[in-house]
Amino acid sequence: MRYPKFFLLLFVSMILFSACKPSFEQKTSQAIQDVMNEFKAVGVSAAVVKDGKIVYNESFGYKNLNTQTTLTNDDVMRIASISKSFTATSLLQLVDKGVISLNDDVSDLIGFKIRNPHHPEIPITLKMVLSHTASIRDKEDYFTLDHLNPAVYGDCEESYFEYKPGEGYNYSNMGLNLAGTILEKVSGVRFDDYVRTNVIHKLGLYGGHNIDSLDANRFALIYTNKNGEYVESKGAYKSRSEDMPSYVFGYSSPIFSPTGGVKISAHDLAIYMMMHMNGGAYNGVRIISEESAKAMQTPVWKIQKEGEEQYGLCLREFIDFVNDEKYNVPGSYPIGHTGGAYGLNSIMIWSPADGWGIVAMTNGFTAVEGKSILKSLTNAIYEACIKE
């Protein structure tokens, strides 16, 4: 008769042990907060995908320091350069429809001559622009195409590097603003409206480029650390209403920042990420073809010198980023993109091999020498929530 009593005690012990053992949600939340403390972060929103679903979504800290309003999962942030992938995704829709080709000369698409004056005989293609191999140099003001327009700046020599288009890599915000303008010109729909209708809303998400079409109450304010104090970066959510009367269709698209202007929550960005993880479709809704999804994720440029990236079409491979050797060998690199502007840092990263994905964004932090807050957040979340 002792055996039933023994098993009862064993069962009770197991229940008590499991009750005391932190859940993966608790471990993940603690890991994120530890990173926040190290970087004195204003706020962090994060979402984790495993096995085709969001298994974790939490927000910490503040959306507004002045009012001490806490950050929630419904709040949106300007995600900076992850936005480039939204522009590329939209253009790949037109490629799928046969309207344009990645090998098209962008001069034919935009309506004026785009040529590197050092190599005027070489056409600059859409594929080059989306992979940062077009030899286009960022100017201080890349929110206008004037610096690429011969009618304004002649041969525009200062807007180009000396290497041949397609034979070098330099990250170019100007190039992606050109790509967004091409989307507008070719589709016949204003840039921000096209992306919102055909990508964001089609996936059932909330967000977009145009400040004036979104609820300002959901914006998580973005801060930069200046001399030890956090200062709001008001330019991050600047209204474009004053620019609209002079808006030139097919030319003024850069004011919406195709290169970095999407505002979205971590939760909804994770759903967008799952669409790319699933080869261009999510929940029965196809956004781009499997062929186009693969093209975006396949490096056009492979690292040849320090500072370069393994870059596809507005998506990149992460090398020596996740602290697990299995993801640091060719064929196993995670894919995604990062963003950084106005004090915000953001990341969207996933493993095609193992089906996990992480989204994290912070609306302000203090730099720590020799460390990256995005790498720290990614690895903290990976260790707590994903690694077995």
Q: Which residues does each PLM region occupy?
A:
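Short, surface-exposed loop or secondary-structure junction motifs
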Residues: 117-335
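Short active-site loop at a secondary-structure junction
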Residues: 37-45, 66-128, 161-174, 257-260, ...
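C-terminal motif of bacterial Sec signal peptides marking the signal peptidase cleavage site
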Residues: 18-19
